[in-house]
């Protein structure tokens, strides 16, 4: 009976160790995925920022050209 108890405890102990390693790897994988998601979000924000900046520049130039044309037409 003692041999069975010791064997059972050994199996349970090794199972718990294996389970803890699996959980640790799972957490590490989740952290890596989370970091990748954060990096992708930052890239998207950067793209939107540069896009809006370029649109703003183009709109400003177009407005300036329109005002300049109106002023030039008024002087003629």
Curated annotation (Swiss-Prot):
Residues 30-41 have a biased composition (Acidic residues). It is found in: Secreted. It comes from the Eukaryota. The modification Glutamine amide is found at residue 73. Its main location: secreted. GO terms for cellular component: extracellular region. Transmembrane segments: none annotated. Antimicrobial peptide. This is Dermaseptin-S7. It comes from Phyllomedusa sauvagei.
């Amino acid at each position: 009976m003692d041999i069975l108890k010791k064997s059972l405890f050994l199996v349970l102990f090794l199972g718990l160790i294996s389970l803890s390693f699996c959980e640790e790897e799972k957490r590490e994988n989740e952290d890596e995925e989370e970091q990748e998601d954060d990096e992708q979000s930052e890239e998207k924000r950067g793209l939107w920022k540069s896009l809006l900046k370029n649109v703003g520049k183009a709109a400003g130039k177009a407005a300036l050209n329109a005002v300049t044309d109106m002023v030039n037409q008024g002087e003629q």
